[in-house]
Amino acid sequence: MTAAAATVTVAAVQPTPVFLDRDATVERLVASIDEAAASGAQLVVFPEAIVPGYPDWVWRTRAWADQSWYRRLWEQAVDIPGPVTDALGSAARRAGVWLAVGVNERVPSGTLYNTLLYIGPDGAVAGVHRKLMPTGGERTVWG
């Protein structure tokens, strides 16, 4: 006899980030988490690097042509743990959902990582996965 598979309701959410504005983007994510949970989602998934936005200039400019973009990304990147994980954790706990959120993570050494952040329904960071082999122009920004 086999056990019945559990059904999990997943919400794939793609709100527009407020580009290079971490706090405003997180506010949008929190609203989306609440909406997805109200619709029955148990797992809410967001895109790659949504906080504070994907650095798409890497595909349009010469490498290192304009350091101001990198500096702005660094200033708005996410510390783990930190205020962003606290805000997302509170939203996950309130909604009772799992989260998978793509962020630009900064570390004290000065490196930025394209990171997937997992947060459990208890509000705690359950896991962190860094994209360690960025491709093409992404290598001028991440890891």
Write out the residue ranges for each language-model feature.
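Active-site beta-strand/loop signature of hydrolases that rely on acidic residues for catalysis
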Residues: 25, 34-62, 92, 99-100
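N-terminal phosphate-binding loop and adjacent alpha-helix
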Residues: 14-32
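Active-site catalytic loop in hydrolytic enzyme cores
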Residues: 3, 80, 85-86, 90, ...
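Basic/polar N-terminal segments that are highly enriched at the extreme N-terminus
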Residues: 1-7
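Short, basic and Ser/Thr-rich N-terminal targeting/leader segments
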Residues: 6, 39, 93-99, 110-113
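A short acidic, glycine-rich active-site loop
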Residues: 67-86
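Active-site-proximal beta-strand elements of phosphoester/diester hydrolases
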Residues: 7-19, 115, 128-130
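Catalytic metal-binding/acid-base residues of hydrolase active sites
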Residues: 16, 50, 104-105
